[in-house]
């Protein structure tokens, strides 16, 4: 909205310096600063309101160190989503469908996560929203994104085609499997971020790094010259995704101000599902979804640890009559907790690994 107002003033009166509103880098920076300030200013009052009202339930089987979090307010994802939506509303162009598709994803999965948190902490329903209803919400979002991009002419250039990391001219056409692939990626990534949200600052910090990288890819993909030079798909108008990405990044950083150890608030499923869906949709829109196992490798490893733990336990129980475990506890961050690693050390090391995955993903731009 502020973009359109300033653009009107610039076109009508041509004041010196206001033409900067047309630059993606300026609006991305403005969205980032706005998002950060919203979190920093609103955070203390929001946390004060939630304290004593919305308290995160802690599982009995959680590591001893983790049980200390039982007095922490949750649903901090509301603050993240609010900061993102307001910043994007102010600085992004809404004639670009990429923008509001991401916003729909963030809002929709935020609502699903909110229902889950609300049922757990307010209604005291054990387990919160039943998994099948979460899955239905994720499938519906994937179906909407898939169908919209399939039928909207704005996406007809590439449509169901995507690129393969490390290969210059290799592409894959999903064909009739495009929509199922979209559903799978949105479901998998949103659940992966949700699983990672177990330690102070882990999900918010890791998400900020991943989305920052995706925003960089989006900026390059939205520029025909850069896209041609780097052999990545040119996404007409896709540069607007960079504006949205920076709003998401700094909302995570602003939230991290209060979520870093010792945390004052937890994002809950409200935030983790919303962030996961944003990562998935951005990657899909810029045709970099096959890069996610590298770029979002920490989320992939967390999910893999849970899958391996469950499958191995079931196999050994069937084979030997007693279930055995690969890890002391899954997801992976709890394994290291039980090995005696300090929470801050786990989080910082996971951030470092995420940065390394980020650098590896950048290498794919030239190693083709």
Swiss-Prot record:
The chain crosses the membrane at residues 30-50, 72-92, 99-119, 139-159, 170-190, 201-221, 238-258, 264-286, 345-365. It comes from the Bacteria. Its cofactor is Mg(2+). PROSITE patterns: MRAY_2. Keywords: Cell cycle, Cell division, Cell inner membrane, Cell membrane, Cell shape, Cell wall biogenesis/degradation, Magnesium, Membrane, Metal-binding, Peptidoglycan synthesis, Transferase, Transmembrane, Transmembrane helix. It is found in: Cell inner membrane. Pathway: Cell wall biogenesis; peptidoglycan biosynthesis. It is a multi-pass membrane protein. InterPro entries: Glycosyl_transferase_4 (IPR000715), PNAcMuramoyl-5peptid_Trfase (IPR003524), PNAcMuramoyl-5peptid_Trfase_CS (IPR018480). GO terms for cellular component: plasma membrane. One of its GO terms (biological process) is regulation of cell shape. It catalyses: UDP-N-acetyl-alpha-D-muramoyl-L-alanyl-gamma-D-glutamyl-meso-2,6-diaminopimeloyl-D-alanyl-D-alanine + di-trans,octa-cis-undecaprenyl phosphate = di-trans,octa-cis-undecaprenyl diphospho-N-acetyl-alpha-D-muramoyl-L-alanyl-D-glutamyl-meso-2,6-diaminopimeloyl-D-alanyl-D-alanine + UMP. One of its GO terms (molecular function) is metal ion binding. It is an enzyme of class 2 (transferase). Its EC number is 2.7.8.13. The keyword Nuclease does not apply. Belongs to the glycosyltransferase 4 family. MraY subfamily. Catalyzes the initial step of the lipid cycle reactions in the biosynthesis of the cell wall peptidoglycan: transfers peptidoglycan precursor phospho-MurNAc-pentapeptide from UDP-MurNAc-pentapeptide onto the lipid carrier undecaprenyl phosphate, yielding undecaprenyl-pyrophosphoryl-MurNAc-pentapeptide, known as lipid I. This is Phospho-N-acetylmuramoyl-pentapeptide-transferase. It comes from Chlorobium limicola (strain DSM 245 / NBRC 103803 / 6330).
């Amino acid at each position: 909205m502020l973009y359109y107002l300033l653009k009107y003033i610039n076109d009508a009166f041509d004041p010196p310096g206001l033409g900067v509103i047309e630059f993606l880098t300026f609006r991305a920076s403005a969205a980032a600063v706005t998002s950060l300030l919203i979190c920093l200013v609103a955070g203390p009052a929001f946390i004060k309101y939630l304290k004593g009202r919305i308290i995160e339930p802690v599982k009995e089987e959680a590591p001893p160190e983790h049980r200390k979090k039982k007095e922490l307010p949750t649903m901090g994802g509301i603050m993240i989503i609010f900061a993102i939506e307001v910043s994007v509303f102010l600085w992004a162009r809404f004639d670009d469908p990429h923008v509001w598709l991401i916003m729909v994803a963030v809002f929709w999965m935020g609502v699903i996560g909110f229902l889950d948190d609300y049922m757990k902490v307010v209604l005291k329903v054990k387990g919160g929203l039943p998994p099948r209803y979460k899955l239905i919400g994720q499938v519906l979002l994937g179906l909407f994104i898939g169908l919209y991009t399939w039928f909207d002419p704005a996406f007809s250039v590439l449509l169901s085609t995507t690129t393969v990391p490390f290969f210059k001219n290799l592409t894959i056409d999903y064909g009739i499997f495009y929509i199922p692939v979209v559903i799978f990626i949105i479901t998998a990534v949103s659940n992966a971020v949700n699983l990672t949200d177990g330690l102070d600052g882990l999900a918010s910090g890791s998400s900020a790094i991943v989305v920052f990288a995706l925003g960089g890819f989006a900026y390059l993909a939205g520029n025909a010259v850069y896209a041609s030079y780097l052999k990545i798909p040119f996404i007409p108008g896709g540069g607007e995704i960079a504006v949205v990405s920076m709003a998401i990044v700094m909302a995570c950083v602003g939230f991290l101000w209060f979520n870093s150890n010792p945390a004052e608030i937890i994002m809950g499923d409200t935030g983790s599902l919303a962030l996961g869906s944003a990562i998935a949709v951005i990657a899909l829109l810029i045709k970099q979804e096959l890069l996610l196992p590298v770029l979002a490798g920490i989320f992939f490893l967390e999910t893999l640890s849970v899958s391996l733990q469950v499958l191995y336990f079931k196999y050994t129980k069937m084979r030997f009559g007693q279930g055995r475990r690969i890890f002391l506890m899954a997801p992976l961050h709890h394994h290291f907790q039980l090995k005696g690693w300090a929470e801050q050390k786990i989080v910082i090391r996971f951030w470092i690994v995420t940065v390394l995955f980020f650098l590896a993903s950048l290498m794919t731009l030239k190693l083709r």
